[in-house]
Every structure is written in structure tokens, then in C-alpha cells.
Amino acid sequence: MQTYSTPLTLIIVTSLFLFTTQGSSSNAVEPTKKPLKLANYRATCEDRTRTLVTRLNTSHHSVVWQRYDIYSRYMRRMPPLCIITDAYKETTHQGGATFTCTRQNLTLYNLTVKDTGVYLLQDQYTGDVEAFYLIIHPRSFCRALETRRCFYPGPGRVVVTDSQEADRAIISDLKRQWSGLSLHCAWVSGLMIFVGALVICFLRSQRIGEQDAEQLRTDLDTEPLLLTVDGDLE
């Protein structure tokens, strides 16, 4: 009896440990390495309200709304936002955002950029899943869209969002481009003048050489032939 008590105790302790580990890991945040197949893409701005509406028929079914964080190396499955079983509507909070869930839609309030992610609806009765890829843009980006001057590069690669700053950036950019073009034209013009001066000097030197040779030939043709006779006088 004592021979089997130690292995039996070991088996019981190991089983309890595995059961406890599985139970605690099911409630923890679990990373997933497999990307989700996304069909729906949505976008909104910070501090706005956005509603995600499912196309699945989830009437009278238990559903789960869940969020996947995409800022980590792998998409992390966060704790469920809402689990709708008997209640028609449920409101919950995660971070600074507020979520109101029903079987058909998920409404998000007070969003920030950190709430960007994949929002998943799973029908627990049929097993159907629908994913929404929700992008939350910062306020500066949305203000830039409203002024219709978004993503204009200002000094130091800064995105200019204010209209007056954008006007100043456009003017300074045009001045910079014009000065660069003027400098380039001046450099090309100077180079062409220098090359032209060299060509003119070369041609003039050749012409002067030819004139000197012609003058020398002319002088040789017109110069009288002088004969000197040396002799003794008696």
C-alpha cells in the first residue's frame, strides 16, 4: 500500500497543478501568432463615437465581443469586452474607452489611438466569427483633413495641420524651390560661359597661329634675295 501511495499522490498533485494552470491561463491575455482574416475596415478619429454593425444573424444567440491589440509583436487577444447571453445590451469599460454591446453591434465612445485594433464578434451558438479592423486616427490628423491641408511637409519633416501654418509652409517651400532652381540655372549658365570662353580662346589662338604662319609666308615671298660676293681687290 505504501508502494503505490507516492506515485498516486504525485499524479494527483500534477493533475491539480495542470488544471489550475489551464484555468488561470484561460483568463489571462493570450498572444496569437496566426493573423486573422479581415474583411471589414473602419476608421474614425479620437474622441469620436463609432458603431460596428455585424452582418451575421445572431438573433437570440449568445455572442462575445473581443479586441485584439495590434501594437505588440503579435496580435494579443485581450479580455472579452462583452458577453451577451440573456441581456439585450451591456456596457463595459476598457482603458479610457466605453463600449456598449448588443448582439448586432458594438458602439465605441471616447476612443484614443491605443484603441486601434481588431474587434471580433463570435456567435457562440453557430461558431461564426466576424472581424472589424478599426483604425483610430489622432486629432491632428483629423484636423488636417478638415482643413484639407493634411500631410503637407513643413520644416523638419513636420506635418502642418493649421491652415495659416500650411500657407506659410507652402510659400516658404516655393521660395526654397525657386531659390534652388535659380542657383541651379546660375551654376549651369556659369559653366556654359566658362566652356564658351575656353572654346573662344582656343579658336582665337588657332586663328592667330594661322595668321602668323600666313604672314611669315608672305614675308618670305616678298623679301629680296641678297647675294654677297666675297673677293680680293687688287
Curated annotation (Swiss-Prot):
Location(s) in or outside the cell: Host membrane
UniProt main location, coarse: host cell
Keyword Transmembrane included in the entry's annotation: yes
Keyword match Membrane: yes
GO cellular component: host cell membrane; plasma membrane; viral envelope
Transmembrane parts of this sequence: 183-203
Protein's membrane topology: Single-pass type I membrane protein
Keywords (A to Z) from UniProt: Host membrane, Membrane, Signal, Transmembrane, Transmembrane helix
Signal sequence, renumbered to the chain: 1-23
Top-level taxon: Viruses
Name used for this protein in its record: Membrane glycoprotein RL11
Species classification: Viruses, Duplodnaviria, Heunggongvirae, Peploviricota, Herviviricetes
Gene: RL11
